[in-house]
Regions:
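Short, flexible segments with low predicted structural confidence
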Residues: 18-19, 40, 53, 72, ...
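A generic structural signal for short
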Residues: 31-32, 53-54, 85, 109
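Hydrophobic beta-strand core positions in alpha/beta domains
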Residues: 55-56, 133
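Conserved phosphate-coupling serine/threonine residues in phosphotransfer and NTP-handling enzymes
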Residues: 58-60
Length: 167
């Protein structure tokens, strides 16, 4: 980056400082706790009360995942926390979900994957998981509708679906 900045803006450009500030801002934005999705507390409590094992399987670095779990005090719910940072293949490959199912002792066809991303839905479907899309930033499209088991508008609807045995 420094070379490119100097090439475009000349030798007087404080490239090192600019790059350092960009990294700092990016890290700050990435590590800032994300807001909890509506219905998360209720869903986790219900799953826990019914002794359903849970895992976090995220492409984010482990330090970020653990930071969010610690911030919201949710770590105790999860039997496994898996980061894709050390896996050979990331989503849309199903590797992270297959590893999570292995750690939970569940078969993919009996394991629910909740996803808000296209690559996550692709990974869940590729691994043979019960894949429920809960769109956040990107709405479901035709490809997602062909791949997922169900779509829920929020985690309250996921909880209702579980309670009624829909998936």
């Amino acid at each position: 980056y420094k070379r490119q900045l100097r090439r475009f803006y000349g030798d007087g450009c404080p490239a090192a400082g600019i790059v350092e500030e960009l990294y700092r801002l990016g890290y700050e934005a990435f590590t800032k706790p994300v807001p909890k999705m509506a219905g998360l507390d209720e869903l986790l409590a219900w799953l826990d009360a019914h002794h359903i094992p849970m895992a976090v399987a995220s492409s984010s670095p482990m330090t970020i995942i653990e930071g969010h779990l610690d911030h919201w005090q949710l770590g105790h719910y999860f039997k496994a926390v898996i980061s894709g940072e050390h896996l050979a293949r990331s989503k849309p490959a199903p590797d992270i979900f297959l590893l999570a199912a292995e750690k939970l002792g569940t078969a993919p066809a009996e394991t629910l994957v909740l996803e808000d991303s296209y690559n996550g839905v692709r990974a869940g479907a590729a691994g043979g998981f019960v894949t429920v899309m809960v769109p956040d930033m990107a709405p479901a499209n035709d490809e997602m509708r062909r791949l997922y088991t169900a779509e829920c508008r929020d985690l309250y609807e996921v909880l209702e679906g579980l309670q009624k045995g829909r998936f």
